[in-house]
Amino acid sequence: MVNYSNCHFIKSPIHLENQKFGRRPGQSIKISPKLAQNGMVEVIGLDFLSSHYHALAAIQRLLTATNYKGNTKGVVLSRESNSFQFEGWIPRIRFTKTEFLEAYGVKRYKTSRNKYEFSGKEAETALEALYHLGHQPFLIVATRTRWTNGTQIVDRYQTLSPIIRIYEGWEGLTDEENIDIDLTPFNSPSTRKHKGFVVEPCPILVDQIESYFVIKPANVYQEIKMRFPNASKYAYTFIDWVITAAAKKRRKLTKDNSWPENLFLNVNVKSLAYILRMNRYICTRNWKKIELAIDKCIEIAIQLGWLSRRKRIEFLDSSKLSKKEILYLNKERFEEITKKSKEQMEQLEQESIN
């Protein structure tokens, strides 16, 4: 239902990417009782496991393949009709279970029946991750700046919401099969009668998608899993942070698609620990484990070609010895992505017109 075979890069709004990163001081915050009965939420944003990254990337690949126009009837939202204060078009995408599993990266294996079929365990993990995105409420806090009468002002919104809405259906079920779905929704035999999904993204997945976004390979997380199967969730968050921080810095330095020479990111080690949501290490002040985990993240980023090198510097901060990372971006990798993704986006735009 979605032709994504030529979609090798995905677009993601920076507003969405920002939700993946932790922030200091990492404490609970009070929010409106309308958002949570006890008025407290422990995590702000998207605290993902690696499987959730894969599932979200699969949805974004399917959305990108339709140039964020969808392939079934979407909806138009007014600012008054949603807690995101979003105004505009929300696309919907219809796809089969097979299309999702392929976009997720689930492997097929040759069975005793001489057929290539999806791994049952991997497929179950992928579908569980999809359902997590559609059922788990996330506290999303975002800001948008604008100018009014020469003065910069900030619009802020926050809401407790899943990041996608999932519709699905089955046809021709027996009573036994209907009950079976309630018991084992991912692996029941009746899934052969599954008629597919329709997914509606929440506004933050499409907000300013044409003007404030990052581009990344569609297989960005599959590459991590293939090369480093035991990589922690911190590695996934770190790669996303590098891509997002690089895009933000380039936007400040240049107005075209070029990447400046010797572009680097400068980040305090403690701040990076918060960004990567290393809360259990931070709470116990286990800085040795934090540095080891960060070292591994940087090593993975270098081997995957996102960074060319790094430098750790010690300095005094309020009379205390602190450390920061200087992370040098691999210009060639980012330039290649920019060039090839531009060609893809132009092709998708042309196809949507035709």
UniProtKB/Swiss-Prot annotation:
| Keyword tags | Plasmid
Superkingdom of the source?
A: Bacteria
Additional free-text comment from the UniProt record: PGP2-D is required for growth within mammalian cells.
Name of this chain's protein: Virulence plasmid protein pGP2-D
The organism encoding this protein is Chlamydia trachomatis
